[in-house]
Regions:
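C-terminal motif of bacterial Sec signal peptides marking the signal peptidase cleavage site
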Residues: 14-16
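Sec-dependent signal peptide recognition
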Residues: 2-7
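Bacterial signal peptide processing site
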Residues: 18-20
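A compositional/structural signature for long, glycine/proline-rich flexible linkers
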Residues: 22-364
């Protein structure tokens, strides 16, 4: 009888173990096909190491929900302040996004544009590694070192009119030999948010430690080109949280400031870096979102001083040169300077603009 009881107990234990294993396996392979199903209570715990891929999965699913695979999302208007899906977007360029299955080969074709105008194509891989930009018109092959899909960001400079942008966008095309949907393992939303907030909170410390020149080095790189020499795991994680979809330094150099109080007035006076494309300065709130339609000035829009330098003012009133309003509910603001196709002075000599920021007065 004892042997029978023991045998039954062992059988029950084995069945229970197998059941638990099946439940664990089910949890492990929960797959999301939409952004809505990406977050799950039983999803995988997000860590700083996994965050770049996890945030990229979320972005891919979001675009797939909107247009499916091998399709464009065009905006022939500059980014509206009431619709900013990604932190630190800007109004210096018009955006098109494409979500493409490249598993069996794919290419993208861009139409002719007038000489001197800016149009760039930037592929982002599933693990948030950033390929170097391609410029101008032509047909460009698309490949990836990992996964099966690419997120492609296309930028047209703000000197185009909305009508001109629409005509250009209508002539863009995708040629792909496969159209399989993208899927991702589900993740736990609480851990995702905790990690994201912790990464964003590290930036002031990194700015203090590395300085304005080196703070963003290593955030946006490709394992298959020379940018890999700049890669660090820490900066890779920070880049995904602070500026998902950012560009390689050869294409765009970013300068990020700390937070400034909105109680004061500030000015930046600097020499023109003479970038191959243009520079821009954009104002954000504490969380990294624009809060006014007039959120930026660029070398295409700012009025230069008589000596060829530029002054951009922040919260100094309408009579101040190139003034940007800084009032917003967060009580602080920060800026990002972007160098599009940066000059040798910016790349090789580390010329930066943010260090010239000075408090002028307490009056707005």
């Amino acid at each position: 009888m004892k042997h029978l009881i023991l045998a039954v107990s062992i059988a029950i234990l084995l069945v229970s173990c197998q059941s638990n294993k099946k439940e664990e396996a089910t949890k492990a392979v929960q797959v999301a096909t939409t952004e809505k199903t990406f977050f799950s209570k039983d999803g995988r715990t997000v860590t700083p190491e996994t965050y770049p891929r996890d945030e990229t999965s979320r972005q891919l699913l979001k675009k797939q929900d909107l247009v499916g695979v091998n399709a464009f999302i065009h905006s022939n208007k500059l980014t509206p302040t009431d619709d900013q899906p990604i932190v630190r977007m800007n109004r210096d360029t018009y955006y098109s996004m494409a979500f493409i299955d490249v598993s069996k080969g794919a290419s993208i074709t861009m139409p002719e544009i007038p000489e001197g105008k800016y149009m760039s194509i930037q592929p982002v891989t599933e693990d948030h590694r950033i390929q170097a930009m391609k410029y101008g018109s032509g047909t460009f092959d698309l490949t990836t070192h990992t996964g099966t899909h690419l997120y492609v960001i296309i930028r047209l400079d703000a000197t185009f009119t909305e009508a001109e942008v629409k005509k250009i966008q209508d002539k863009m095309s995708i040629n792909a030999n496969s159209s399989n949907p993208f899927t991702a393992n589900t993740v736990n939303e609480e851990s995702f948010t905790t990690v994201e907030n912790a990464l964003k909170a590290k930036m002031p410390e990194v700015l203090k430690r590395d300085g304005f020149v080196n703070a963003t080095k290593g955030m946006f790189t490709d394992p298959n080109d020379s940018s890999i020499e700049l890669f660090t795991q820490e900066k890779y994680e920070l880049g995904a949280a602070l500026g998902w979809g950012g560009a390689q330094m050869i294409d765009n150099i970013y300068e990020t400031s700390g937070n400034y109080s909105t109680d004061n007035c500030y000015e930046l006076t600097f020499e023109d870096p003479k970038n191959l494309a243009f520079w821009s300065i954009t104002v954000y709130d504490k969380k990294g979102f624009m809060f006014n339609d007039l959120a930026n000035y660029s070398s295409n829009t700012a009025q230069a001083n008589e000596d060829g330098t530029y002054t951009v003012s922040f919260g100094c009133g309408a009579d101040s040169p190139n003034n940007l309003d800084i009032n917003n509910p967060s009580g602080v603001f920060n800026i990002v300077v972007r160098h599009y196709q940066p000059s040798k002075r910016v790349i090789n000599d580390d010329y930066r603009i943010v260090p010239f920021m000075k408090e002028v007065s307490n009056e707005q």
